[in-house]
Amino acid sequence: MLIPWQELSPETLENLIESFVLREGTDYGEHERTLEQKVADVKRQLQCGEAVLVWSELHETVNIMPRSQFRE
């Protein structure tokens, strides 16, 4: 089930994004990016619709995923 990110408090959204970024592991790109940069990137992806917040009833967890990978 999709969760409208706009309906979350800014603090809750920030915490969800930080948790997601920290779970994603180490970035082995050419340039190391700060946590703040990664959080800003995910927030931008949510705002422009590239990513969505998804509630899993089975696992009772929230995840962030590319919109193209979400299947209802």
Curated annotation (Swiss-Prot):
InterPro entries: UPF0270, YehU-like_sf. It comes from the Bacteria. Pfam families: UPF0270. Belongs to the UPF0270 family. This is UPF0270 protein YheU. It comes from Escherichia fergusonii (strain ATCC 35469 / DSM 13698 / CCUG 18766 / IAM 14443 / JCM 21226 / LMG 7866 / NBRC 102419 / NCTC 12128 / CDC 0568-73). The gene is yheU.
